[in-house]
């Protein structure tokens, strides 16, 4: 599948780097705040349940999880966070979707536009590239805890599209509509998840040369360093030479 590309693997490695600098804590807390707006009880709120599971997987402290829930429900101040997605282009005509969670959309759109422009990209209108992607659910699990057969039996029975080997982990991919059912089936089977989230999978990928790939990675790094940016999705695939450098 298009989602299981060298670009996807780089995102996983970058995720671990983000965790080292604390970026993932901020992202996880914001996702909990947004999810809790629909209700503070994870039993009846599947998005909140997934957000809490993802936060625990990166060891976000319990008090921070609880405070984030209270912000989302309005029990504490600081819950005025909006989630938005900006679309645009990077070097080489690569399509980008930048998902943000912000308390000031004017500030955030200006910052995202500036970052894109500085790195050879441009902001586009809403809908300009979203049609190039499919929304999927992706559940990540530790490689050494489960066999592919174990996961296939549970996940595919619950409606998953695929179980793939991503090197250090397994990935269970679902259609957006089947995400909660698959995640709940894995939970019921006692499977521990490293992460469970929605992502935008490109329908087709653009193979870029090494220099363009370097420019794109600098752009992605700059976007992800912004405190309001939650996720960056793109439709490029990196050449093996550059992948080796980044690995």
Swiss-Prot record:
Annotated localization: Cytoplasm
Lineage: superkingdom: Bacteria
CC annotations in GO: cytosol
GO biological process: regulation of DNA-templated transcription
Presence of keyword RNA-binding: no
One example GO MF annotation: DNA binding
InterPro entries cross-referenced by the UniProt entry: Integrase-like_N (IPR017856), TACO1_YebC-like_2nd/3rd_dom (IPR048300), TACO1_YebC_N (IPR049083), Transcrip_reg_TACO1-like (IPR002876), Transcrip_reg_TACO1-like_dom3 (IPR026564), YebC-like (IPR029072)
Annotated segments matching region Disordered: 1-22
Key words of the record: Cytoplasm, DNA-binding, Transcription, Transcription regulation
Family annotation (SUPFAM superfamilies): YebC-like (SSF75625)
Alphabetized Pfam families for the sequence: TACO1_YebC_N, Transcrip_reg
Primary site of residence: cytoplasm
Similarity remark: Belongs to the TACO1 family.
UniProt xrefs under PANTHER family: TRANSCRIPTIONAL REGULATORY PROTEIN YEBC-RELATED, TRANSLATIONAL ACTIVATOR OF CYTOCHROME C OXIDASE 1
Protein name: Probable transcriptional regulatory protein Dvul_0986
Organism (species): Nitratidesulfovibrio vulgaris (strain DP4) (Desulfovibrio vulgaris)
Higher taxonomy: Bacteria, Pseudomonadati, Thermodesulfobacteriota, Desulfovibrionia, Desulfovibrionales
């Amino acid at each position: 599948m298009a989602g299981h590309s060298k670009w996807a693997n780089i995102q996983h490695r970058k995720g671990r780097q983000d965790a080292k600098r604390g970026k993932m804590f901020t992202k996880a807390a914001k996702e909990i705040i947004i999810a809790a707006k629909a209700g503070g009880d994870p039993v009846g709120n599947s998005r909140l349940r997934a957000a809490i599971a993802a936060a625990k997987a990166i060891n976000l402290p319990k008090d921070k999880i609880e405070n984030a829930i209270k912000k989302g429900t309005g029990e504490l101040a600081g819950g005025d966070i909006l989630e938005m997605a900006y679309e645009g282009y990077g070097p080489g005509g690569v399509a980008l979707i930048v998902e943000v969670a912000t308390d000031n959309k004017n500030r955030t759109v200006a910052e995202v536009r500036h970052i894109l422009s500085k790195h050879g990209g441009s902001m586009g209108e809403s809908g300009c590239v979203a049609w190039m992607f499919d929304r999927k659910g992706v559940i990540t699990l530790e490689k050494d805890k489960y066999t592919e057969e174990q996961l296939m039996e549970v996940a595919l029975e619950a409606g998953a599209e695929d179980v793939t080997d991503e090197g250090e982990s397994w990935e269970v991919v679902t259609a957006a509509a089947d995400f909660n059912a698959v995640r709940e089936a894995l939970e019921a089977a006692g499977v521990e998840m490293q992460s469970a989230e929605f992502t935008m999978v490109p329908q087709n990928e653009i193979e870029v040369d090494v220099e363009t790939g370097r420019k794109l990675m600098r752009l992605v790094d700059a976007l992800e360093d912004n405190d309001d940016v939650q996720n960056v999705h793109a439709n490029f695939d990196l050449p093996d030479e550059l992948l080796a450098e980044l690995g």
